[in-house]
Amino acid sequence: MEAILKNSARDNCSAMRNPINDNFDWSFLYQRYDNTCRRFDPTSPYLYDITEKPKNDRYLYNSLVYKVNNERTMKGYIGLGTYEAILYWKLYSQPAATQNVCAKLRNDEHKQRTIDTALIGLGAQLPLKVTEDISSIINLYDLLDAYGPQLYGLMNPCALPARTTLLHFLYPNVVPLFDKQVLLAVGVNEKNANRRRDCLYQYIQFAWRESKKSNIPKDWQESPLRLFDMALWVTRGQTTTNCERKKNEAATYRNH
């Protein structure tokens, strides 16, 4: 683990900066965020297991956080429908990616059975809760790697952001979302930094620290960690929307 973390000393993965200052207007966060997610489709066939159709990205996110927690508490693992909805949330802004991953999965019973089995096995090994301990988080990624080949949509070696998205929904208060645009927002611009474990682990610890700052709301529906992530998205500027962000990441899935 130490070797992984030390690798980032060679570049600015170890020099992340928080662009969210004390003047950030949190009262407009939802509005600004929603304006970046216009490709969201509440009637998507990949949301078949979501009982109350969400009206936007945020509503789906909060529904999934609740659904994942409820399923893990009741039966120890998340179901296929929840998994597919998470993939859709990650990929919906890029039609090619949803066709290449979500549509193929929805039309392939063998893939569905394989994922079902993997989710049960993974759920049996994942702890119900984790703390902000980087060694424990690294263990989660190692465990998810072992199941990666069976989890369609996560098996690409470059799909680190997607694997992080799954872990985020499993542990929304501890594992932050991670991708290229988040890294750019905090000043990391190395090519393929979003595929590097050392940058990931540095960012996780950075997000833990920064999300505890007093200016971030603590009593909203989303966790402070998620609110920090949303603020990074909108702070990236008007020209880099959430959809563009996901589009950049979605290119990972074209070779599945």
Where in the sequence are the language-model features?
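Generic structural signal for hydrophobic core residues of well-folded globular domains
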Residues: 86-93, 105, 147, 167-171, ...
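C-terminal accessory module of base-excision DNA glycosylases/AP lyases that mediates lesion recognition
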Residues: 1-80, 176-256
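Helix-hairpin-helix/helix-loop-helix acidic hairpins
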Residues: 92-158
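A generic alpha-helix structural signal
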Residues: 65, 87, 138-141, 204
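Small-residue-rich anion-binding loops in enzyme active sites
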Residues: 60-107
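Alpha-helix initiation and capping sites
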Residues: 76-80, 131-134, 156-160, 176
